[in-house]
Structure formats: C-alpha cells, structure tokens
Amino acid sequence: MKKIIDSISDIISLYDVFILDQWGVMHDGYNGYEHAINSVEKLIKENKKLIIISNSSKRKISSISRLKNLGFNKNHFIEVMTSGEMIWQEISHSIHNYGNNLKNCFHIFDSSQEDGLEFRNGLDTFNFESNVNDANFILACTPFENTEPIDYIPILKNALDRDVVMFCANPDFVTIEQNNKKNMFCMGTIADLYDHMGGKVIILGKPSNEIYEESCKKIEDFDHSRILAIGDSLDHDI
C-alpha cells in the first residue's frame, strides 16, 4: 500500500541507510535545495549513514568536489558514486570482461564543455578514434553539441555491423536544461536506441543493481530492509 509522507521525519526511524540521488533531489545543478541541506543535517544528527549515487557521466571526484559549493558537507557521506565512475572503472580494469581486446574507443561527448575530456584521464592505454569505423567500443558520455537522437543512427548502424559494444556513462533518458527549462536527451536515449537495434549496451548506473551494490560496500553488517533510496524519476531511479 502506498503511503504519502510530508517529511523525511515521518519515516526516519524505519531506516539506517539513506541513498540519495543528486540532481532533482539535492540540488538543481546550480544550488543545493534548502530543504535537502536541512534534511541531510537532520539525518546525520540521527546517526544515519548517507550515500550519494548519481547518473552523472563524470567521475565521482567531480561530484564530491561540488558538494561544498552546493551547500553540503562532503564528510556527511560515506560514499559518493556515479555511473561515470562505474563505467571508468570497468573500462580501465575490465572487471567483468564485457569485451575482448578493447583498445580503440569512439568517445561521444560534448567538446564544447571545458571538462569534456577529463573522463579520458588515466585511460592512456586506449586509442580514441574520430571515426566509429576505427573503434571496437563506444564510450557514450554526453551528446555531441547541437545534435538530436536521429543524428546518431548512422553511427549506430556502423557500430552494429561490427558488433561494437557501447558503454553508457549516463543512462538517464532526459534531463532539464536549467536556463530555458527545456528537456534535453541524455545518452541513455542513445543507448536504448542501440539496444533496440540489437547492439550490446553496458549500463552500470541507476537503475541497475551494480551501482547500488558498489555504493554499499563501505557499510558493514547492514540490513537491506533498512536501506531507503530516494530519487525523483521512476525511469531513472527504480
């Protein structure tokens, strides 16, 4: 039976661990929500364990470094995990061996963003190709500048013909552009398109089990029934 609550205080005694989404739950991309900042402080006073997970395509150090500017104390969180971090670790260390001899990468990202190339730091053993025909895997982080989903079909067809695997660093389908409040597609939309075409897609962010399991590794002897995940999207968080 669904229960509608007015405040986190209504259920705080039922859980020991709180897993929090970032965008839309804690902040709007620019400023932390006052109610979220206050709720985090209250949870800490109640000795609750707090974890942040995000479908950001960036590595987790980026999310950690932003917390202070958004009004949060980074020391309140025992772990911060992003889908980008999960994918970076997988590509770097081949944890699950999703592909053989992955060396040549076609990197989808917005080159107009100052930090667009930061994801490549530490991936020096890989060749980053400008043509998908020269790649044996795709790293999908953020959409190319001024593109729409239909623009990716030729790229995906070429990749599909050669069984190229796609690693999706941000599995969200859409986000909201804060300046004009417009919906913008994320790489989850492109990954879903490739999947429906028959391509192999690796997603380790929400709502997959992997990111939840990884983020909870720093907690010992916890009861799964006393973990609460808080998000703002049924498609992205559940």
What are these regions (language model features)?
Residues 1-238:
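HAD-like aspartate-dependent phosphatase fold
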